Amino acid sequence: MSFNTFGHMFRVTTFGESHGVAIGCVVDGCPPLIPLTEADIQGDLDRRRPGQSRFTTQRQEADQVKILSGVMAHPVSGEQVTTGTPIALQIENTDQRSKDYSEIKDKYRPGHADFTYEAKYGIRDYRGGGRSSARETASRVAAGAVARKVVPGMTIRAALVQMGPHAIDRAKWDWAEISNNPFFCPDKDKAAFFEEYLDGIRKTGSSIGAVIEVIAEGVPAGLGAPIYGKLDSDLAAALMSINAVKGVEIGDGFATAALSGEENADEIRSSNHGPVFLSNHAGGILGGISTGQPVVARFAVKPTSSILSPRKTIDREGHDTDILTKGRHDPCVGIRAVPVAEAMVACVLADHLIRHRGQVG
């Protein structure tokens, strides 16, 4: 299996399966002399960690990260810093329940990657989905924590802005509310609604989708390159690679199709601090290159495919059958996609910053 690496100069390779001994990543291309400890990474992992509320999978994983390489104590200050060599990060799996998946050993779960993995490779890890499990995203979050250290002047935040058909009231957006509810929702009133709404879905054994918005502030103008190195192209690819993501938009995205040229153009004025854009329909990127405005992206997460209703499928022999999914699953996988999205955007921005410095100094 290839394609486990993304990035050009800041490169991340993830490894491991949902029910294997461990998962992790190797980060290559991180500049030297950047302070980095396990505590710097653990905070981000704790935000993604499962089992923290009744609205996520009840799999109990501590997700304690270990730095295996790429750091050492600075010879003068004694502070632990990066050395410029590959940084290997490992997270042990401690709460696997593979017996929950014995029924699907020979059956394909509708909506999952079971059929496609076996069609491609002739074998699949049915225990929790193997590499296709959202468990893999913990490795991305660990890598994203390293990436944040490469771009300390940028603030990268994400929020759940819609669950099912119910969107937040953007007039009530408050970043401080993100940490006050289990949904990473910036609207206090809507978070209270989501609690009752998702409880109802969870108790029926069903699931629901979500929309996540990511905003990166402090991104300097000039990141990205024309044609095949566009910043928005790489962001879209990074976000689309997250489990269950089915659509990505930058800035106003698909809504711009309904706008006129006058409405959509981000007009510019001068100021003592440089150009000032009067709007940000483009989401901070024009021609594939950052404008200096906040970079804005949104993506849609489909409902978790593992639900408690019997469904029609086929077995490995091609016979029609029914399947009832067991195991521990998220009723809304979009919730834990929030810190994953931040991590992916951080990795892309770190990669583009290093590429930009290499090209133009």
Swiss-Prot record:
The gene is aroC. GO terms for molecular function: chorismate synthase activity; FMN binding. One of its GO terms (cellular component) is cytosol. PROSITE patterns: CHORISMATE_SYNTHASE_1, CHORISMATE_SYNTHASE_2, CHORISMATE_SYNTHASE_3. InterPro entries: Chorismate_synth, Chorismate_synth_AroC_sf, Chorismate_synthase_CS. This reaction introduces a second double bond into the aromatic ring system. It is an enzyme of class 4 (lyase). NCBIfam families: aroC (TIGR00033), PRK05382.1 (NF003793). This is Chorismate synthase. The lineage of its organism: Bacteria, Pseudomonadati, Pseudomonadota, Alphaproteobacteria, Hyphomicrobiales. Keywords: Amino-acid biosynthesis, Aromatic amino acid biosynthesis, FAD, Flavoprotein, FMN, Lyase, NADP. Transmembrane segments: none annotated. Its cofactor is FMNH2. The keyword Lyase applies. Pathway: Metabolic intermediate biosynthesis; chorismate biosynthesis; chorismate from D-erythrose 4-phosphate and phosphoenolpyruvate: step 7/7. Its EC number is 4.2.3.5.
